[in-house]
Amino acid sequence: MGLSTLEQKLTAMVSAPVEALGFEFVGLEFIRGRVSTLRIYIDSEEGITVDDCADVSHQVSAVLDVEDPIQTFYNLEISSPGLERPLFTTTHYEQFIGEEVAVVLRIAMQNRRKWQGIIKSVAGEMITVTVDGKDEVFALSNIQKANLVPHF
């Protein structure tokens, strides 16, 4: 997923404190609004508890308070990736080859921004998704948002 400059800066700042606590830093998203939201996704093999989220929130808040990279009011949310796991990196796409994904593009391809299909392959920064039997290739930098599609 192509991250904004702010999201890149935030990732550089918060990934180390998250990992120092023993968690996987999955990724983050900054959602602008009247009150913006900084959502940080963490994971571990044992799963994530509310206490884990509180510990990470405390640690990350301390870093953000010192560095002060966000020049507006915002809420900090710490979350597990959940069933509709967001995909941020090529490693995430490689990990979930064969799984269904919903993709929203920054710039439309073939007059559409929303796509859904099966992750087929990853080559460099290019993601191939099979949509209705046809392979579509997306540049990671053009992916605004991507989530796994759970099946129940």
UniProtKB/Swiss-Prot annotation:
It is found in: Cytoplasm. The keyword Cytoplasm applies. It comes from the Bacteria. InterPro entries: Ribosome_maturation_RimP, RimP_C, RimP_C_sf, RimP_N, RimP_N_sf. Belongs to the RimP family. Required for maturation of 30S ribosomal subunits. This is Ribosome maturation factor RimP.
